[in-house]
């Protein structure tokens, strides 16, 4: 069980409401994914949770995971303008809240379906492989993913302890990728079992 509690609606809204919508948002520029942080903070503050969910999934292949494990104190939260004397907005906790609230309401990231004749094999079902599969599926490209382990997730599944990242969170994201058209082949060592 994870040791951090998910924000309540009130806590998420009041934290998001602290965002001053900077003209040049340092949180956005410091984020390696260049997430639309001010936009989904504004949507959360206005209680537009479906919009916040869609915005957070637009630039991030798995916001429910990065909200939990990304080192926000050195990235987005570390560069938050409010960090100078007022305390940064708890961006990671809000990101997790947005995802989990969306999932409770039945929201899922949208994929167009396989719309091209292109096929790509992704070797390794760790964070980079899952992100790659996400972007390929968003482009309508069929994905076959191979991993020698018996579960997808790589470091997310085998390296990060469950008290920090519940493994069901990773499994849920993998299921969605499979529903979107990804074929997953675990227990398959590329170069040995297949070539």
Give each language-model segment a name:
Residues 1-119:
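Ferredoxin-type iron-sulfur electron-transfer modules and their immediate structural context
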Residues 193-195:
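Short, intrinsically disordered, charge-balanced linker/junction segments flanking boundaries
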Residues 1-5, 34-47, 55-57, 84-92, ...:
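Beta1-alpha1 glycine-rich phosphate/pyrophosphate-binding loop at the start
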């Amino acid at each position: 069980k994870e040791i951090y509690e998910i924000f309540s609606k009130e806590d998420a809204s009041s934290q998001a409401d602290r965002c001053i919508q900077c003209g040049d948002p340092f949180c956005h520029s410091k984020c390696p994914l260049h997430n639309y942080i001010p936009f989904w903070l504004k949507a959360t503050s206005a209680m537009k949770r479906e919009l916040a969910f869609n915005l957070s999934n637009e630039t991030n292949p798995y916001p429910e995971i990065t909200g939990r494990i990304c080192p926000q104190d050195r990235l987005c939260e570390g560069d938050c303008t409010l960090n100078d004397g007022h305390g940064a907005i708890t961006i990671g906790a809000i990101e997790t809240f947005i995802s989990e609230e969306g999932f409770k309401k039945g929201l899922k990231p949208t994929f167009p379906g396989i719309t091209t004749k292109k096929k790509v094999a992704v070797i390794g079902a760790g964070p980079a492989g899952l992100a790659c599969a996400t972007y390929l599926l968003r482009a309508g490209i069929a994905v076959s993913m191979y991993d020698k382990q018996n579960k997808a997730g790589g470091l997310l599944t085998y390296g990060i302890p469950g008290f920090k990242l519940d493994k069901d969170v990773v499994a849920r994201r993998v299921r969605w990728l499979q529903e979107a058209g990804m074929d997953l082949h675990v227990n398959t060592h590329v170069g040995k079992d297949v070539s």
